[in-house]
Amino acid sequence: AIQRLNLSGSFMLLLFFVGSFLFFEWHYRYFYRFLEQFVLFQTSESYAHTLLGEPGGGVEYMASGLTQCFSTPFASSATIALLLTLAAGGLALFLKTAGTASGNLWIALLPGLLFWFFPQESIAPLLTVSLACWLAVLYNAIKPSWVRYGAGLVLLTFAYFLATPAHLLFACFIAMSEAWRREGTKSTVVAVAALVWAALLPLIAMRTCYILPMREA
């Protein structure tokens, strides 16, 4: 079963949410009200069809949809703070379920703090990181067996089509989790297989799902 964070960890995540909200509300109150996705989402009828027809387009479309509420006061800051907290919470749970000795939540806050210093125009990267972290938590929640490894393969493929490059980050999480388990050859094989499958997914997709006519290529 998926473990929970302790009370101190939950309180720290709450403080991180409040701090993120205040930071982005103070420094980027109007910046996120004028995004390309906001205009395209409203004016282009083919926007959804175009995005959903390419790898990672699903998360881009979700990000574009979320930006529709950014014209509402406090909406952009609250959305970004929530996504940062979700990513931090997912990473903290992954570290806990992976059986590492590190219970320090500060490590899980690092990706969010990086976004403070290097904010992006789109919130798609936040959705991507959050998805990868929680897929890793889901993977660790399954008992080590062929079911777990099969689920990892399916989830990697799902992450590629929905939110590439989330599959690469998720594959790294799988490799880290298997390495920390230290079960000998099996863990090594699973870790390598996850990384190889994540690397091959774009090549396989280009040969099967995203074949371009010669004229377009």
Question: Model regions: which residues?
Answer:
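Membrane-interface helix-boundary motifs at transmembrane edges
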Residues: A92-G103, I142-V147, A179-V190
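Start-transfer (signal-anchor) and selected internal transmembrane alpha helices
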Residues: A1-S20, R182-A193
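Transmembrane-helix motifs of polytopic, lipid-linked glycan transferases
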Residues: A81-G99, C133-L138
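Membrane-interface coil-to-helix junctions
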Residues: F21-L83
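Transmembrane helices and adjacent periplasmic/lumenal helix-loop junctions
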Residues: I123, S145-R181, V196-C209
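Transmembrane alpha-helical segments of multi-pass membrane proteins
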Residues: A87, G103-L114, Y149-Y160, T188-L200
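Membrane-interface segments at or immediately adjacent to transmembrane helices
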Residues: L212-A217
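Membrane-interface micro-motifs in multi-pass membrane enzymes
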Residues: Q37, L52-G56, I80, G103-R148, ...
